[in-house]
């Protein structure tokens, strides 16, 4: 008798294929984040603030659109989430101009993020956002995985923000 909990070989291969695509997307998004942070950090603060305002308007518009109806809207949603996180990270890098400020800002974020993914963080706001699938998709960069229906959340706006903050601060400090 076959145990229902055991995965078939086909399902295991399908999961390995999905992990490949997720890893590929994460690497591409990380490299894109580094490149955009480097390029945008050379702009003036005023132009960064104007770009952030445009991205916020774009994000509000795309968040109100259904995901499955328009592929262009989906990509605009992903781009606005990515640029929004990067622009906020660069602005925070200007504000956190020293290593001490940066470290004192990042340590609580890392602790809260770690706690929210453990059983101790059931009541944290971050965990509640993650469990609400609609809000989580709106605050994530979602990509299709071949062989799977729907969209898969690759990374969140907060992750893009923190990564851009680290890269932007590194460019600014050193």
Whereabouts are the PLM-identified features?
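A membrane-topology feature that recognizes alpha-helical transmembrane segments
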Residues: 1-174
